[in-house]
Amino acid sequence: MEKAYWPNPTPENRRDRETYMPRHLILALLAALAAPAAAAQPLTVATASPPTSADPHFYNLMPNNALAAHVFDRLVHQDARQNLVPGLATRWTPLSDTTWEFTLREGVRFTDGTRFTAADVIASLARAPDVTGSPGSFAQFLRGITSVEARGDHTVVITTGSPNPLLPNDLSLVSIIPARFRNASGEAFRTGEAAIGTGPFRLVRFTPGQGATLARNPEHWAGAPPWGAVTLRVIPDDGARVAALAAGDVDVVEGVPSALRGVLERQPGVRLWSTASNRLVFLSFDVAREVTPFATDAAGRPLATNPLRDARVRRAVSLAVDREALAERLMGGGARPAGGVLPPGFFGVSDALRPDRQDLGAARALLAEAGLPTGFRLTLHGSNNRFPDDEKVLQAVAGMLTRAGIASRAEPMPYSVLVSQGGPPVYAYSAMLFSFGANTGEASSPLRSLVATVDRAAGLGAGNRGRYSNLGFDALLQHAMTTVEPEARRALLERAGELAVRDAAIVPLLFLVSLWATRDGLAYEPRADEWTLAQFVTPRP
């Protein structure tokens, strides 16, 4: 039986820190960790963040997408390194610069027994960008599609208004549902009535804010997963998740804090799985307003001119930050310094990009050159529950900027508040610490979301909370995204990434290292996209 699985990423709320598990109690529980799990047993996975909906098209949010990937398939899947692999389409072929043919997998059935056909693809691609009330649409992945045509039950031809060589990458984010649920409500998915997929599991129960219960799909085209039942249990607090593993309450834990890595490595009955992820931690700046509210003089009055609009000031910020200290000392190896929007080795990332090394003298010189020889005051807003050590990183960066002459104050808050106030239509802040996971596994994903000029209709600038705009960058990115020849597209993306860093459109700081823990007897292939998927947890001797 062919084995080919999938996943994908995007923003999500993380830990709320309402629960605290003392380190000594975690150690005591680890000492009593039970024997290896067997495949015949159900599997319980502790996740960090709750999915908000069981509707796979409602919100392009990581917890939602991860839940969907258990129940639904996509035309194209991604492997652990985000390479494209066959999903419900066995192959995809460009017929011209603007036309793609997707050959669909035959013999596939939804978990209610109905056949999967081209009609389901047409309905899904029509529904995904147009779900009422969606706080984060999938429209960016379906931009430019002008028609989707069935040629028999097992062939789909997709036409775009301009060349889109990234269409297969984009379609790896869009779940396929039965055509009859084209107009189904979110409630119909919550109850399970419409949550019918072709994926390795079927949805038994979904409880918003708490998780989901799944049952194995024994007829899955890639072979039945090893677990008869799966519980996805949301435990927001890092320590509480690890303690649940130690107590034998769960079998798999995501988002293990780096501070506990050494402890866990010495514990019998626990296995760790880690990889450098593509999740970028970065600083974003308000460059749209002439006066910005949180850049002030010594008396706290907003400056007459927004200093963050000057690229020299943004470059000074970059030179003020000691990325090595953040990654190694503060996060204990839980991150790696970032010099671009994706780690080296991903498609479209320039080898010329290197993380800035801290140079306080050069930072002060740039501030003086920008007419700010005595610096200014700045408030940094960021999350305190989005990724491990996020509040510590925020506080540390504020301290580093202060040493360079930008007297900075950290203002941590829940991620939900940061997102609601730091983006459209409010744009309340001046400088923000955010993170971003590259959905498509290549450089256009962060560039079109974080750096491109905001254009909702075109699906560009969805994460551009500073409203940076550079028409030269936009033209270069658009050229890259419509260039069919891969090496030419790679070169254009590299140039676009270099331009974004040179102009300090954002300031890349860190790439997170993702860490999972399992009970002995289980294996998990760590993924660059950070997804935790039960179908990839396997028994091992």
Describe the predicted segments one by one:
Residues H77-A80, T93, R105-P135, V148, ...:
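Extracytoplasmic/periplasmic ligand-capture domains
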Residues A34-A35:
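N-terminal signal peptide c-region/cleavage motif recognized by signal peptidases
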Residues A40-Q41:
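Boundary of Sec targeting at the N-terminus
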Residues D16-I26:
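Bacterial N-terminal signal peptides that target proteins for export
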